[in-house]
Every structure is written in structure tokens, then in C-alpha cells.
Amino acid sequence: MDIRGINTPFLDWTGDALALGIFEEGTQITGELSQLDGKLTGTVQELIQEAEFEGKAGTKAVTRVGSNSPIRKVMLVGLGKAEDLQLNSVREAAGAIARLAKLEKVKTLGINLPVVNNDGAKTASAIAEGILLALHQDNRFKSDPQENALKLENVDILGCGEATEAINRAQTLSSGVILARELVNSPANTITPVTFAETAQEIAQTSGLTCEILEQEDCEKLGMGSFLGVAKASDLPPKFIHLTYKPSGTPKKKLAIVGKSLTFDCGGLNLKVAGASIEMMKMDMGGGAATLGAAKVIGQLKPDVEVHFICAATENMISGRAIHPGDILTASNGKTIEVNNTDAEGRLTLADALVFAEKLEVDAIVDLATLTGACIIALGDNISGLWSTDQTLADQLKAAAETAGEKFWQMPLEEKYFEGLKSPIADMKNTGPRAGGSITAALFLKQFIKDTPWAHLDIAGPVWAEKENGLNNVGGTGFPVRTLVNWVLSF
């Protein structure tokens, strides 16, 4: 599928289907829209009336045009109120148009959406993202991968003729999101710690990064008892992945992104019970998947920022070697942990990963993890929790997320809640009381950071979509690759 920006007015465009964005107050035919309606013998006005189209955000309508017309179909998509228009408005409108074009088996599509803040490049980029992400369908495991194959061949973004670079960048960004989606979608018999590490090596080779894989013996030498405690029950070897992107000149900043990478989590000896969706625990590496997706994009966009991408990859399984509830582990910073729940394993793997990241002497560390069900209870499926020791860093991430159209809500690091993690026989337990579970999880991770500005993203809700939602189809969403990339590019 070829996506391009052109300066052709929608009045002069020809092709299979012309898609128009309409505001709530714009359903009265005037100006150029009136001219188009006249050219199409009243088709637009007729569609508005018959579909009772009011321009509300997310609504859409389509109709055929007479056989002598230079276009075959007209599509309308609602934009909501004009004063509420944002980049994400056109991004999601473009996604709705793309899905409709697929349903209608359109081959050539013209899209006319309003330019946001007089910035044609950013608008074209958002439109391209919307198209690519809404149309992504993961058919790799179907016997006929071409079933319901896309017919769309060419998309023209009208009124954005100088946007080639922005569209190319959107395609690069979307490829990282799609990589993360497909990693999350992959079952645990295809994505293992070994194949996850191989994916990281492939990214390094194709995107200009370096890749270091620490094997179990290397991790033992570094004292990673917390990570290895989780890993020892699995028959598959753990892989500690360290990807590095360095710019050609002196970097403006040095950053670290750390992703939780449990390729499968059965809960360990605290086995997940019925109703705990054990079959969905292939997605417990969603943080690592987004980390690799961001690494792929950053390597191709080549910002003047040094970035370290870290994933401690393993499974949490059951065997005679498994950690027991009550065991004590020693992390690589010397702190001891009483394991009172083997199903709170992600934070144990992240503990050593955070210590490793801080030793790189970076300016900021961001970790992301499908860490707690408590965060889903608090914020639902579409919003990630954000905790940070540094408000400047938190504000940077929130700004990056707003540009991406991904949602975060800053949560408190309530130090008093650490009382619930105290152990009589170790420095801390790995879980606290049920109340405030996402906060105590963040406080646990904080024990493995000394002075570096740090943020924790609990992405347990938004990493997976149970139904079509915005630009997401059912399955992995690739959240929050776009936020991470925007954050890195902001320096």
C-alpha cells in the first residue's frame, strides 16, 4: 500500500473513494463541499440526510456515486466539535476511514481531513499512522494468511503535498508498533526467551544498534539473584538483553528504557487459578515487546540521544527447581527480598534490570511493565499508570503520550505504603496488602534506583485489546511504543 501526500484539492481528485471529515456543525452543505455536491449531483447531501449523519466523532457513512462520476464512492467520517480537534482526532478518523475502505474493497482512496494547528506535516503523519495501525491484521498463525486480504493499494492525503518525510517517519513508527503487537500476540511456544533475544539481535543488525546478550552465567557473576530466582524453574535459559543506540556525535542525553519480559507467566508455585486468564499470560512480555519496538524505530530515526534498551527475558514456571513462597532472594544491589508470592515475579526481574540500567550512568530511566491487575482496577483498560521520582520526567512522558494519543495518569509514590512491604527476615517482601497494590509495586521497584530520575509505567490494561478500539484491533496494541519514541525525540 502506497501512502502519499498531494496538494490536489478534493474537488479535483479522482479515484475509487473520496473520504471527507465533517464537524458536528458542518453538516450543512456550503463552500467547496457544496461545489463537490453539485459535481456529484447531490450525493453528499443525500448521504447526510439518509444516514442521519450528524458529524459526531467516530460516526461514518458511505454511499455509491453514479457511474459517470470520477469517483465511485463517497465516505463521511465525523470529527466531533471543531474546537476539540487534535492530532489524535485526525489519527482516529483516518483509522475509521481505512477500516471502511477495507470493508468496501476500495483500491484507491483520497482522504480530506482538516490540518491541525496549520501543521500539514504532523497532520499527514497522524493520518498515515491511523491508516497503518487500524489496518494491521496479524494473520501469521492462520492456515490462509491472505484471508480477507486488503485490497487498498493507494492512499492520497489531500492538501499535504510537502509531507513525504513525515509520512515516511509515520511508517517507521508504525512498524515498531506492529512489531510490538505481533510479539505480544505470539504464543509462548513461538516467542520464548531465546527467540525474544534473537529478535533483539535482528533489530540490532537491521537498525544500527549493538546487542549484548547476558547468559545465565553472566547474570550469576553480576549477582542477579532476583532475576535468576524467577528463571530457574524454566527449562528454557534466561536471556538478559541489552540493546544500545548511539548517535554519531556527542549525545544530548543518555536514557534507558527497561521492559518487563516474561514470555509466559503461569504464576509459579502460586499457580494462577481459574478465572485468572492464564492463557493470556503470553502478553506478560508486553513491556519488553514495546521496548524492542521502540528500539527498532529509534535505530532507524537516529536521534542525537544515546538510548539503552534492557529486557530481562525468562518464563515463570513450575518445576522442582521453582522458588518457593517464603524463599529469600538477593538482588544485584545487595538488597534481600522475601518472596511471599511467586506470581509477583515481574518486579523481581525488573529489580536487577533497574540496577543494571543505573550503572550505565544514564540521565533518566523509564521502566514499563504489565505489572499489576490493581492498575487495571484503578484505571481501566485504556489508561496506563505513571509513577515517577522526578516531576520533569513525568511531565515529559505525559507530553509525549498526548502527542501519541496514548493515555497515562500520574499516580502517587506514597512512601507510607512501603510499610506493607516490610519483612521481619529480609529487607522487603515482594508484595504488600491488596489495597494500593499498584502503588506498593512501584515502591518495590523504587528500592532498586538510587539517584537517577526514574519513571514506572504500569501498562497492564492498555497493552491488550479485547475488542476493536480506536486504532487497535483485537490483540496486542503496541502500547506505548509511540510515547517512548516521542519522549526520546523530544530531546
Curated annotation (Swiss-Prot):
Family to which the UniProt record says this protein belongs: Belongs to the peptidase M17 family.
Gene Ontology biological process terms from the UniProt entry: proteolysis
Keywords recorded for this protein, A-Z: Aminopeptidase, Cytoplasm, Hydrolase, Manganese, Metal-binding, Protease
The keyword Zinc appears for this protein: no
PANTHER family: CYTOSOL AMINOPEPTIDASE, LEUCINE AMINOPEPTIDASE-RELATED
Cellular component GO terms, alphabetical: cytoplasm
Binding-site residues for Mn(2+) 1, renumbered to this chain: D265, D343, E345
EC number, UniProt record: 3.4.11.1, 3.4.11.10
GO molecular function: manganese ion binding; metalloaminopeptidase activity
This protein's name: Probable cytosol aminopeptidase
Highest taxon of the lineage: Bacteria
Residues annotated as the enzyme's active site: K272, R347
InterPro entries: Leucine_aapep/pepB, Macro_dom-like, Peptidase_M17_C, Peptidase_M17_leu_NH2_pept, Peptidase_M17_N
Subcellular compartments: Cytoplasm
Cofactor: Mn(2+)
Gene giving rise to this polypeptide: pepA
